[in-house]
Amino acid sequence: MITTKELRNKFINYFESKNHSHQPSSSLIPFGDDTLLFTNAGMVQFKDVFLGIEKKDFSRAVTVQKCLRAGGKHNDLDNVGYTARHHTFFEMLGNFSFGDYFKKEAISFAWEFLTKEIKLPVEKLWVTIYASDDEAFDVWHKHIGLAKERIIRIDSSDNFWSMGDTGPCGPCTEIFYDHGEDVAGGLPGTPEQDGDRYIEIWNIVFMQYNRHADGSTTDLPKPSVDTGMGLERISAVLQNVHSNYEIDLFQALIKKAQQVTHAKDINSPSLKVIADHIRACAFLIADGVLPANEGRGYVLRRIIRRAIRHGNKVGAKEIFFYKLVAELVSQMGEVYSQLIDKRELIEKTLIKEEELFLKTIENGIKIFDAEIENLKDNTISGEVAFKLYDTYGFPFDLTADMAREKGLKVDEQAFLAQMQIQKQRSKEAGKFNVDYNSLINSQVKSEFRGYSTLIEDAKVLEIYQDGQLVASTSEQVSAVVVLDKTPFYAESGGQVGDKGILEGIGFEFVVEDVQKSGEAILHIGKLVKGHLNLNDELTARVSDKPRLATAANHSATHLLHKALKLVLGGHAEQKGSLVDENRLRFDFTHDKAISRSKIEQIELLVNQQIRANYPVTTIETSQQKAKSLGAEALFGEKYGDIVRVISMGDFSIELCGGTHVAYTGDIGLFKVTSEGSIASGVRRIEAVTADKAIRHTFTNENKIIAIKDSLKANDTNLIDKIKSMLEQIKNQEKQIAKLKKELLSGSSNDIKETNIGDIKVVVANVDGVDVKTLRNKIDDYKSKNTKVIAVLTTTNADKVQFVIGVSNALTTLIKAGDIAKELSSHIDGKGGGRADMAQGGGNNSANIDQALSQVEKFILNNIKE
């Protein structure tokens, strides 16, 4: 039996023998592409190559790509573990041609690999083609020799692929494997095609058209090929099993899942869920995603919680999920070294999230209890059930069981409708939704000279206006200029683009921003004088002060990154950065606020390196050599085969394409201005350097001097004076609260109380008190009366605030939230709450007496009924 590991290597070796360049898997996070949540196919890392935006030094590639389709092909997470082939995480085997070979070679390679390399029986293979793709039919029938009846024409979107609403697209051919007559299912294109007998194992996409905004298509100048074959699927075929979960890799994980959960049934779907989800979670965390309440972190959190729920379902009595990481590292760590490097972070993250989920369950139950108190009938809405599912991780059946215990039911159809809305959003989020034809797609190459000079003589190669190539541009017109060589740095790696001037005989162009398009550097700005034409010669001048200030901030981020790792730990990895002339911003992984003492340690460490005045050295070398030198590769960056390594003494060494100071001493001074959270597990530090750091220090000193002057204090007694003042304020606030309470008590004689049988009704407006005092008075009424309905308001200018209390014994007659709605309607306000307590406010105090009169009638009418 061929193992998954052997098959992975065999695929790579075969295509390397066909002159394909083996490229490593890209991250699960498609950086620089906001149209996609996760990398979900092998072609994602080559998207800009297919579009002609990015150039590579190879025209053929082979990859084994990490992919995530949070819930499988249709983003249906709940199918994972219950079907034979749904996964969250999977590996995609792929070979690619960028304007090199096309249909004949692509089909031939696939057929040879399947029938010769891994020796699949020809009689087990079927293929589909796009209905009108006669060229593909001829290759299969005439060149490969496949019988006509084994080539199925499909006239649907299943055999036509597009990158988005516009851009590259084309037909595809799919290869299917027949698992045999003992498995249910029919051929592709038949009503029984969704069965498990005929399984798609390889999809070959022929990108030969460009789709325009009006729906029309034109031929691409260089047709390309994109293929994908799921490693897990083809492994199942070769290991003679009908389910992906029966292959060697999954069996090892399932056995470990059974061990740590103490599950009795090894065939439980829950163990498959856990085995699948540990791969998705571990690789997401290794690629820099941490659990959060939105975006990618939210998807990770849901996957973790689903695994935990299934573990509890089969018998887990303690935290267990992290215990599968060791087995995953054993199975896949040799191929994906980041699992080894990030093992500690993965395990700690899973432990913390499982502990958090246990608390979340408790919170969800509280929400459930609060919702059923406000029910008007015996049905919990689908919206509430979905909220419990989506926010608190409650599966529908758990909500239904809890409802059943209280004699209630749940609107399942409304819940499913909410689920469908979410699935549609996820499906749409997985598409490329950009009109690629509107992008500037320059095919020229600009040489960057800005590492060594800020002034360069150059020639105009291209001019764009409104995205269109033009021959010239006029005064006061915004345009984009491409030069043959330039000292201007284009925005990348978190560093903003340069500013400056392009000037020649009779013209001047102000550069406001600089971006990249493929190998072209785009100078974005406005012609403020004269006319600019193609082939004009000019002098490009970068504004030196912004560039030097930006360089100081960029070099400081390298020192900061290293200092964070030394002070906080190796887990403090960069998640993002912004470097301009005014400041630096650095985002990194850390799960709690940084204490003032640690910030001081970080600042001292960075400033020590600045005072050491280390030379900042640069070398260009291979990625492999750079890694051997210990260079830090930054999260989310794309690197070429040859990389630029920036060293600052022996303190910091990173891969970086940005601009830097010559010596660390040129940074001058480093000062942190803020530190805070931007997402769960992600912190942000903002800082300034050089003159701005000095000015920041002056500003803070001046504030302290002003405070000392106001308090008539000095350096020795300032802190004590502030503490004394705060204590006085605290005591005065207590006295004020006491006086307000006495004021309210004194007003009690004026508060109207009505008795309806054994029910006391209190409705009154009390001036000069706050909401807290009203709430305390409401609690006082409820503690002294078993049946009371109290409505208290207070006014300030035109504003109204109110608190409403209803004894628990009366909530079946009337609810505090309903009274709040009635009162709000008379004072231009809003309010709400639980059945026994509500509060709110309004903007019309003029009608308060009339409003309270109406509320009293509302209460009396309800309790008399």
Swiss-Prot record:
Provide the GO biological process annotations. Answer: alanyl-tRNA aminoacylation; negative regulation of DNA-templated transcription
Subcellular localization, as worded in the UniProt entry: Cytoplasm
Record bears the keyword Iron: no
Keywords, ordered alphabetically? Aminoacyl-tRNA synthetase, ATP-binding, Cytoplasm, Ligase, Metal-binding, Nucleotide-binding, Protein biosynthesis, RNA-binding, tRNA-binding, Zinc
What's its EC?
6.1.1.7
User: Can you tell which superkingdom this protein's organism belongs to?
Assistant: Bacteria
For activity, the cofactor(s) needed are: Zn(2+)
Q: Which CDD domains match?
A: AlaRS_core
Residues reported to bind Zn(2+):
H554, H558, C656, H660
> What is said about the domains?
Consists of three domains; the N-terminal catalytic domain, the editing domain and the C-terminal C-Ala domain. The editing domain removes incorrectly charged amino acids, while the C-Ala domain, along with tRNA(Ala), serves as a bridge to cooperatively bring together the editing and aminoacylation centers thus stimulating deacylation of misacylated tRNAs.
Record function comment: Catalyzes the attachment of alanine to tRNA(Ala) in a two-step reaction: alanine is first activated by ATP to form Ala-AMP and then transferred to the acceptor end of tRNA(Ala). Also edits incorrectly charged Ser-tRNA(Ala) and Gly-tRNA(Ala) via its editing domain.
Which HAMAP family does the record associate with it? Ala_tRNA_synth_B
What protein family is recorded?
Belongs to the class-II aminoacyl-tRNA synthetase family.
- Record protein name field: Alanine--tRNA ligase
Query: Whose protein is this, by species?
Result: Francisella tularensis subsp. tularensis (strain SCHU S4 / Schu 4)
